[in-house]
């Protein structure tokens, strides 16, 4: 129990005033004091739910389905399992993502009746839980622009995208308010999981409310209004967007959505979410939004609204300042050479939805759907880095292997548990078998990296920033 949890009187008064009458204040406070249940989402870009369930059963992990996400589960592990969930082999291989259950709901809402997305935007995407969930829902097809304003969070976003084998994402690093003017009516689907006061996160962080004040809520609301306007301008007519927060007050939730109607009138339609999952009506507002108080589903507090854009809007005028784009498309000859080498050395091929772009000695695989947006905005990175050229051919990259390879590849080398630990510590390994050339390294049927045979050992190709120490699986 989080008995020492800090709940300001002004916050409790606000909840008392706005919480539906059928919900109990005592139950709300009791729920806030209960530790949050641990939850994960299976990454279907790497394994199916059934395959993951088998792995979990072997490890005696108990999985309870999250009602609003087909790939989400609350997880309970044996007390004897002392390895941190993030240090398990399954997590490091990208087979699952540690994600709070409520935060899976926005992407579920965005994908409902919307399974043919060509161009999507995740406007505030770090650390990457919803970006990777959306990419999996898109099956790595189309294009997904993942934006993050915070410099310190871009690195972890990039790391999670690579770990999960996402290949259709372009990363940007801007204040989300620029999208409406820079890329007007460009995206058919937009997720705006807005920065907020975090009132719903108190079960995870007992100190979450120490910096809370009614004044800070109003200030954050001003930013949210700007962001939702920008998102709506960036949305194509006929497109849908989801606005979500992990907070509970109306100022940052219902009022922000109503502001959109005040600004754009009949161009806005709220899409009711009462049938999103079984018992969703328990959290349904009169507008059709989902306002999740922590006691309803024993989860974090959350808010989700789905909005359709019915007609065109006039975007703000902007002056773009863009430097020269440093990449050029690979020529047909270059592309054929890259494909042939990738096939002959690693028995791999680039997905049809990607194409080669060159920067100096680097070869990248961009989502084809990104091509119309090149030159319209600056990008932190697009797609994934496939290789670096050298005198004898190509030096394939770890992130490309994580995006392209599967454990049934004929070049795979399967490691033992001890060898896999050594691998993640950045050391070369010496299996009791031999091979030649570059090899895809696997552990328990999951790809974990790329190595190269040197005599009877596999030279470790794990990027330095991924090297781990301590208590691993």
Swiss-Prot record:
Keyword S-adenosyl-L-methionine: yes
The reaction(s) this protein catalyses: cytidine(1407) in 16S rRNA + S-adenosyl-L-methionine = 5-methylcytidine(1407) in 16S rRNA + S-adenosyl-L-homocysteine + H(+)
Enzyme class: transferase
Xref: CDD domains: AdoMet_MTases
Entry keyword set: Cytoplasm, Methyltransferase, RNA-binding, rRNA processing, S-adenosyl-L-methionine, Transferase
Entry annotated with the keyword Methyltransferase: yes
Gene3D superfamilies linked to this entry: 3.10.450.720, Vaccinia Virus protein VP39
EC number assigned by the record: 2.1.1.178
GO MF assignments: RNA binding; rRNA (cytosine-C5-)-methyltransferase activity
Chain positions recorded as S-adenosyl-L-methionine binding sites: 124-130, 148, 175, 193
Pfam families in the cross-refs: Methyltr_RsmB-F, Methyltr_RsmF_N, Methyltranf_PUA, YebU_pre-PUA_dom
Annotated family: Belongs to the class I-like SAM-binding methyltransferase superfamily. RsmB/NOP family.
NCBIfam families named among the record's database cross-references: nop2p (TIGR00446), PRK11933.1 (NF008898)
Name listed for the protein in its UniProt record: Ribosomal RNA small subunit methyltransferase F
Native organism: Aliivibrio fischeri (strain MJ11) (Vibrio fischeri)
Phylogenetic classification of the source organism: Bacteria, Pseudomonadati, Pseudomonadota, Gammaproteobacteria, Vibrionales
Chain's gene name: rsmF
């Amino acid at each position: 129990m989080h008995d020492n949890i800090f709940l300001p009187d002004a916050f409790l008064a606000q909840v008392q005033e706005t919480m539906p009458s059928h919900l109990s204040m005592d139950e709300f406070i009791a729920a806030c004091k209960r530790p949050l249940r641990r939850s994960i989402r299976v990454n279907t870009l790497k394994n199916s739910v059934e395959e993951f369930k088998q792995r979990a059963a072997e490890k005696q992990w108990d999985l309870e389905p999250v009602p609003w996400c087909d790939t989400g589960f609350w997880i309970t592990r044996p007390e004897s399992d002392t390895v941190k969930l993030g240090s398990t082999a399954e997590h490091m291989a990208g087979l699952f993502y540690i994600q709070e259950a409520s935060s899976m709901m926005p992407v579920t809402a965005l994908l409902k009746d919307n399974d043919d997305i060509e161009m999507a935007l995740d406007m505030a995407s770090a650390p990457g839980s919803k970006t990777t969930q959306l990419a999996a829902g898109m099956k790595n097809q189309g294009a997904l622009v993942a934006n993050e304003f915070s410099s310190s969070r871009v690195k972890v976003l990039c790391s999670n995208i690579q770990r999960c084998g996402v290949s259709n994402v372009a990363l940007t690093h801007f204040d989300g308010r620029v999208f409406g003017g820079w890329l007007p009516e460009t995206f058919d689907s937009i997720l705006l999981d807005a920065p907020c006061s975090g009132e719903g996160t108190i079960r995870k962080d007992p100190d979450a409310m120490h910096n809370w004040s009614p004044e800070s809520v109003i200030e954050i609301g001003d930013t949210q209004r700007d962001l939702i306007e920008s998102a709506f301008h960036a949305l194509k007519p006929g497109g849908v967007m989801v606005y979500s927060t992990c907070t509970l007050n109306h100022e940052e939730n219902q009022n922000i959505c109503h502001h959109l109607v005040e600004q754009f009138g009949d161009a806005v339609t709220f899409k009711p979410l009462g049938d999103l999952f079984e018992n969703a009506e328990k959290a349904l507002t009169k507008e059709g939004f989902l306002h999740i108080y922590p006691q309803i589903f024993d989860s974090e507090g959350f808010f989700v609204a789905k909005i359709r854009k019915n007609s065109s809007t006039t975007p703000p005028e902007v002056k773009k300042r863009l430097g020269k784009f440093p990449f050029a498309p690979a020529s047909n000859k270059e592309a054929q050479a890259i494909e042939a080498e990738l096939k002959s050395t690693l028995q791999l091929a680039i997905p049809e939805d990607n194409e080669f772009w060159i920067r100096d000695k680097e070869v990248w695989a961009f989502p084809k759907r990104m091509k119309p947006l090149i030159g319209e905005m600056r990008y932190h990175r697009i797609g994934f880095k496939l290789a670096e050229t050298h005198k004898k051919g190509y030096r394939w990259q770890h992130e490309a292997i994580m995006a392209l390879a599967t454990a049934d590849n004929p070049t795979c080398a399967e490691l033992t548990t001890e060898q896999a630990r050594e691998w993640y510590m950045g050391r070369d390994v010496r299996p009791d078998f031999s091979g030649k050339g570059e090899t895809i390294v696997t552990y328990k049927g999951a790809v974990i990296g790329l190595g190269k045979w040197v005599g009877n050992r596999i030279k470790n190709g794990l990027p330095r920033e991924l090297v781990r120490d301590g208590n691993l699986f």
